Regions:
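Conserved, well-folded catalytic cores of nucleic-acid-processing
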Residues: 27, 46-50, 84-87, 94, ...
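Conserved glycine(s) of the Walker
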Residues: 16, 155, 246
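Active-site glycine-centered loops adjacent to acidic/histidine catalytic or metal-binding residues
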Residues: 58, 119, 149
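Conserved G1/Walker A P-loop phosphate-binding module
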Residues: 1-75, 79-81
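P-loop NTP-binding site
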Residues: 184-293
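Conserved C-terminal guanine-recognition region of P-loop GTPase G domains, centered on the G4
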Residues: 51, 75-143, 216-218
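Canonical P-loop GTPase G-domain recognition
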Residues: 113, 122-180
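Catalytic P-loop NTPase motifs of RecA-like helicase/translocase cores
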Residues: 39, 62-64, 96-97, 124-125, ...
Length: 293
């Protein structure tokens, strides 16, 4: 009998959802940085074997929205509660159990198995961990709690074992050669945005959107033109940097990662444009592929 199902990963920002997703899928699907709100979209990673297909979804961290982009991000997270066969709620040893109580209440009401994963347990001691497990059991009594460390891979195999046991009998939902629902262009934009998150401070990374305007691929190489959109002229100057050095660094590091990702030579040109207040515009967000009510 073949098994298949949707395993959706939810939780607050910066608890290790994307790192866990990449581990479970065995591919670098989601960008992962030390900054919160790195993930903006819902991203599927598909794990295939002869008798099983697990469709993982990484989702944005749950936040109280301050602008329309964050509303879209919350929509992605809430939709993951509706269509899951198994829900992975990821927290960590630092996070308070009552953070984002409204979202936790929605998790409490889901009708599918919930695995509550307490990440980063290498940062605490056994006594505090026991107290944390008890506190989470009170918050989500139906959840099966598994302490993990995504960075050291501790107990990740236990998580995978439970997923396989809980997965429903079903034919595959996608072709067995498919490993994600996203096109190649999406990963280009995410890798460029990852470098911006790493190399710029404060509000700059959160004011950026990346669009691929040209993607031409042949047997050995890919030619890419990408536009980095910011909200203000002052941000454009910061992204470009003195004599273009900052932008050149981003492009160089992105090219290296893209060559590893695609296993081809990459020719990357980057441009910076201003799209005023795009994070608060329904029209622009839809143009950039975000889910709006």
């Amino acid at each position: 009998m073949h098994k298949a199902g949707f395993v959706n990963i939810v939780g607050n920002p910066n608890v290790g959802k994307s790192t866990l997703m990449n581990l479970l899928v065995g591919e670098r699907i989601s960008i992962a940085t030390f900054k919160s709100q790195t993930t903006r979209h819902r991203i599927m990673g598909i794990l295939n074997t002869d008798d099983m297909q697990i469709v993982f979804s990484d989702t944005p961290g749950v936040v109280k929205p301050n602008y329309k982009l964050q509303e879209s991000m919350l929509n992605f997270s809430e939709s993951a509660l509706v269509d899951a066969d198994i829900l992975l709620y990821v927290t960590d040893v630092v996070e308070k159990t009552d953070k984002n109580a409204d979202f936790i209440e929605k998790v409490r009401n889901v009708k599918v198995p919930v695995l509550l994963l307490i990440n980063k347990i290498d940062l605490t001691n056994q006594e505090d961990l026991v107290r944390l497990v008890e506190a989470w059991h009170e918050q989500l009594p139906q959840a099966e709690i598994i302490p993990i460390s995504a960075t050291s891979k501790f107990n990740v195999d236990t998580v995978m074992k439970r997923i396989k046991e809980l997965l429903p009998d079903s034919p595959p939902y996608f072709g067995k050669d498919q490993w994600t629902d996203k096109p190649a262009r999406f990963f280009v934009t995410e890798i460029i945005r990852e470098k911006i998150l790493l190399y710029y401070d404060k509000e700059i990374p959160y004011s950026v959107e990346v669009v691929v305007e040209q993607f031409k691929e042949d047997a050995k190489s890919i030619h890419i033109n990408a536009v980095i959109y910011v909200e203000r002229e002052s941000q454009k100057g910061i992204i470009i940097g003195k004599q273009g050095r900052a932008l050149k660094k981003v492009a160089t590091e992105a090219r290296k990662t893209l060559e590893h990702f695609f296993q081809k030579s990459i020719y990357l040109e980057t441009f910076v444009k201003v799209d005023k207040d795009w994070r608060s515009s329904d029209k622009e967000l839809k143009n950039f592929g975000y889910q709006m009510d």
